[in-house]
UniProtKB/Swiss-Prot annotation:
Taxonomic classification: Bacteria, Bacillati, Bacillota, Bacilli, Bacillales
GO cellular component annotations of the record: cytoplasm
Quaternary structure, from the entry: Homodimer. Probably interacts with PlsY.
PANTHER family: FATTY ACID/PHOSPHOLIPID SYNTHESIS PROTEIN PLSX, PHOSPHATE ACYLTRANSFERASE
Metabolic or biological pathway, per its Swiss-Prot or TrEMBL entry: Lipid metabolism; phospholipid metabolism
Provenance organism: Listeria monocytogenes serovar 1/2a (strain ATCC BAA-679 / EGD-e)
Subcellular location field: Cytoplasm
The encoding gene: plsX
Reported function: Catalyzes the reversible formation of acyl-phosphate (acyl-PO(4)) from acyl-[acyl-carrier-protein] (acyl-ACP). This enzyme utilizes acyl-ACP as fatty acyl donor, but not acyl-CoA.
GO molecular function: phosphate:acyl-[acyl carrier protein] acyltransferase activity
InterPro entries on file: FA_synthesis, Phospholipid_synth_PlsX-like
Protein name stated in the entry: Phosphate acyltransferase
Keyword match Lipid metabolism: yes
Length: 337
């Protein structure tokens, strides 16, 4: 399989992107990489060109570019060319650690939306206390959503959890302010009713935010505005907790001695809370796998994302979503233009 990679997107591009690519092709003999970006800069780090092809371009989308305008004006940007390769059948999937909004726009405008899917959804896998993790969507592709959209999000998340995360009959929950069916606003109440009355996936009811990391569900569905705030809250809380723990352990001689014995365990805890270890955030609802690697990804983060995309292609996640979208009868009412 061929995977198109934006070599110029992310905080540590192109170095960490290239190092991650080399690690992936060394591990997976069935993977070929199309690297889009500045050939001179890429070659500074690309020491092994086995199954790696560079497609040179001087143009790239910056982190502060306005997404839609950048995609339309920068036709030769590395991110856009990577998506175009997928559109033209030259690659099976694409990856970028660059501008999230631009990648979503590229996925929609260049690769295109799946017929019958009303809205795309951005879905990372977030950590849980056991290290199993859960898929959450939408985390920012849509600020607003309708009940029909959340119904479809449940289907897409369930397919991914089953195919890639290898969970038999994934538990799908709806994020709400209480577990009772009557709780919530108009969106969550109507979404609950739709999800309860479908048989395309295993809906287990509402989940409260405090239980997200407790392995209660395998897939959690919400609108993009709420989801993005939850993501930032988890990131901020995790960082604050580790910072406070570090300050406590370094306060006084006895604590420092204890910290030296706990160092390995604390590093393991930090790794468990790092959701980039699960790969990137999938843009579900488009015609091919499009995955957003974390902007600060190192080589291992890029490797993990390539491994994730390889699994998506191999397990035919997009093809399964296309085949099963009709099971969610209420959706598919909006234009695919």
């Amino acid at each position: 399989m061929k995977i198109a990679v934006d070599a110029m997107g992310g905080d540590h591009a192109p170095k960490e992107i290239v190092l991650g690519v080399m690690k992936a092709v060394a591990q997976y003999k069935d993977v070929e990489i199309l690297l889009f970006g500045d050939e001179t800069k890429i070659n500074e780090y690309l020491t092994d060109k086995t199954r790696v092809k560079i497609i040179h371009t001087d143009e790239k989308i910056e982190s502060d570019d306005e997404p839609v305008r950048a995609v339309k004006r920068k036709k030769k940007a590395s991110m856009v060319l990577a998506a175009q390769a997928v559109k033209d059948g030259e690659a099976d999937a694409c990856i970028s650690a660059g501008n999230t909004g631009a990648l979503m726009s590229t996925g929609l405008f260049v690769i295109g939306r799946i017929k019958g899917i009303d809205r795309p959804a951005l879905a990372p896998t977030l950590p849980t206390v056991t290290g199993k993790g859960f898929v959450m969507l939408d985390l920012g592709a849509n600020a607003e959503a309708k009940p029909e959209h959340l119904l479809q999000f449940g289907l897409m998340g369930s397919v991914y959890a089953e195919k890639v995360r290898k969970i038999d009959r994934p538990r799908v929950a709806l994020l709400n302010i209480g577990t009772e069916e009557t709780k919530g606003n108009d969106l969550t109440k109507k979404s609950f009713e739709l999800m309860k009355n479908q048989d395309a996936y295993e809906f287990i009811g509402n989940i409260e935010a405090r239980d997200l990391l407790m392995d209660v569900a395998d897939v959690v569905v919400t609108d993009g505005f709420t989801g993005n705030m939850v993501l930032k809250s988890i990131e901020g809380t995790g960082a604050a907790f580790l910072s406070m723990l570090k300050m406590s352990l370094l306060n006084g001689f006895k604590n420092k001695v204890a910290a030296s014995f706990l160092k390995k365990d604390l590093m393991a805890l930090k790794a468990k809370m790092d959701y980039s270890e699960y790969g990137g955030a999938c843009l579900f609802g488009v015609q091919a796998p499009v995955v957003k690697a974390h902007g600060s990804s190192n080589a291992n983060g890029i490797f993990t994302t390539i491994r994730q995309v390889r699994e998506m292609v191999e397990k035919q996640v997009v093809e399964t979503i296309k085949a099963e979208v009709d099971k969610v009868k209420v959706g598919g009412t909006e234009s695919n233009d």
